[in-house]
UniProtKB/Swiss-Prot annotation:
Xref: CDD domains: Ribosomal_S12
Keyword annotations: Methylation, Ribonucleoprotein, Ribosomal protein, RNA-binding, rRNA-binding, tRNA-binding
Protein name from the UniProt record: Small ribosomal subunit protein uS12
Region (Disordered): 1-25, 101-128
UniProt subunit comment: Part of the 30S ribosomal subunit. Contacts proteins S8 and S17. May interact with IF1 in the 30S initiation complex.
Recorded family membership: Belongs to the universal ribosomal protein uS12 family.
Alphabetical list of PANTHER family matching this protein: 30S RIBOSOMAL PROTEIN S12 FAMILY MEMBER (PTHR11652)
Molecular functions (GO terms): rRNA binding; structural constituent of ribosome; tRNA binding
Gene expressing this chain: rpsL
InterPro entries: NA-bd_OB-fold, Ribosomal_uS12, Ribosomal_uS12_bac
One annotated Gene Ontology cellular component of this protein: small ribosomal subunit
Biological process according to GO: translation
Length: 128
C-alpha cells in the first residue's frame, strides 16, 4: 500500500486493455486476400463442417476468418473484407468475412437478417 507522498510522486499505473481482434489495428474492418479456403470441424459437443478462410490482410498479418451464411463463392486470391467477431466453437477464429462486399457475394435466397449477409431485398410476388 503506497503512502500519499509516493502516489504524488509516481501516480498509479493504468492497466492497458487487451483487444479481442489485434490484427485489425483499431480499424472497424480490413481488406485482405484469401490464401486458403477450407472447412474445419468445431469443438465438442458440436459437429459440422464450418467454412473458413486463411486471409493475408493489407497490413501483412495472416488470420483465419469465418465465412458466414449458406454457400459462398470464395477461392484462393479472392479479395475480402474482414471484421472482428469470434466463432465460439472454432478455436483460433477471431474474425468474420463481410458478405456482399468486394469479391464476396451475398447469401442467395436470404429473407431474414439480410443486412448481415449482404442479401438484396426480394422482389414482391407479381400476383398480388
Amino acid at each position: 500500500m503506497p503512502t500519499i507522498q509516493q502516489l504524488i510522486r509516481r501516480g498509479r499505473k493504468t492497466k492497458a486493455s487487451k483487444t479481442a481482434s489485434p490484427a485489425l489495428e483499431r480499424c472497424p474492418q480490413k481488406r485482405g486476400v484469401c490464401t486458403r479456403v477450407y472447412t474445419t470441424t468445431p469443438k465438442k459437443p458440436n459437429s459440422a463442417l464450418r467454412k473458413v478462410a486463411r486471409v493475408r490482410l493489407s497490413n501483412k498479418i495472416e488470420v483465419t476468418a469465418y465465412i458466414p451464411g449458406e454457400g459462398h463463392n470464395l477461392q484462393e486470391h479472392s479479395i475480402v473484407l474482414i471484421r472482428g467477431g469470434r466463432v465460439k466453437d472454432l478455436p483460433g477464429v477471431r474474425y468474420h468475412i463481410v458478405r456482399g462486399s468486394l469479391d464476396t457475394s451475398g447469401v442467395a435466397d436470404r429473407r431474414n437478417s439480410r443486412s448481415k449477409y449482404g442479401a438484396k431485398r426480394p422482389k414482391e410476388a407479381a400476383a398480388k
